[in-house]
């Protein structure tokens, strides 16, 4: 989407509608903050969403953060969002592509994506700091419960009752 991507893995990207709404709110706020700082509209990376009980049990063997017993991931109310990696913008900004002939646009898009990924990698701490501020505000508003996971470089995000 405009605000996030789902990193390929063995976790289906299914969530309850309130999580999708929450992701839209967080993505909008994140990109607004980036725009205020003159940065491109980077997107959030979802690393995990819906999990079966079996998948959760397997994960628990290697991940100390994985809940024992029932996990909120089993209900589609939770996603894990990377705080160390951010995806390039969904669209190449107009100022990069305007005036470029149609036959060159695919090449320019590919080069722009590579450049955005390179900048994202170098600026991941700054982007992560901005995103953490957005999450803290969402938690203060009661629309999200956020858990910082050190070993997996993700925020464990559960939709809040206020959503």
Stretch-by-stretch model annotation:
Residues 66-163:
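Catalytic cores and adjacent binding grooves of peptidoglycan-active enzymes
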Residues 28, 57-61, 129, 133-137:
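Charged/polar, solvent-exposed surface patches and flexible loops
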Residues 8-14, 43-49, 110-111, 119-125:
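Generic detector of short, locally flexible boundary/turn motifs and exposed helical patches
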Residues 39-57:
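Acidic helix-start/capping segments at beta-turn-to-alpha-helix junctions
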Residues 53-69:
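Charged, often glycine-rich, active-site loop that binds/positions anionic groups
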Residues 15-20, 50-56, 118-119, 126-132:
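N-terminal start-of-chain detector that recognizes signal peptides
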Residues 1-40:
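Active-site acidic/histidine clusters and adjacent loop/turn architecture
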């Amino acid at each position: 989407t405009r605000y996030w991507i789902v990193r390929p893995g063995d976790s289906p990207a299914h969530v309850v509608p309130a999580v999708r709404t929450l992701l839209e709110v967080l993505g909008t706020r994140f990109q607004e903050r980036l725009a205020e700082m003159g940065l491109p509209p980077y997107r959030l990376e979802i690393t995990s969403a819906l999990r079966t009980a079996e998948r959760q049990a397997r994960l628990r063997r290697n991940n100390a953060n994985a809940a024992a017993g029932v996990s909120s991931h089993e209900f589609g109310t939770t996603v894990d969002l990377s705080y160390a990696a951010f995806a390039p913008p969904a669209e190449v900004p107009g100022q990069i592509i305007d005036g470029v002939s149609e036959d060159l646009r695919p090449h320019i898009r590919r080069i722009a994506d590579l450049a955005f990924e390179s900048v994202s990698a170098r600026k991941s701490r700054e982007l992560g700091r901005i995103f953490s501020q957005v999450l803290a505000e969402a938690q203060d508003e009661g629309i999200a419960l956020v858990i910082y996971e050190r070993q997996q470089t993700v925020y464990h995000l559960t939709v809040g009752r206020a959503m």
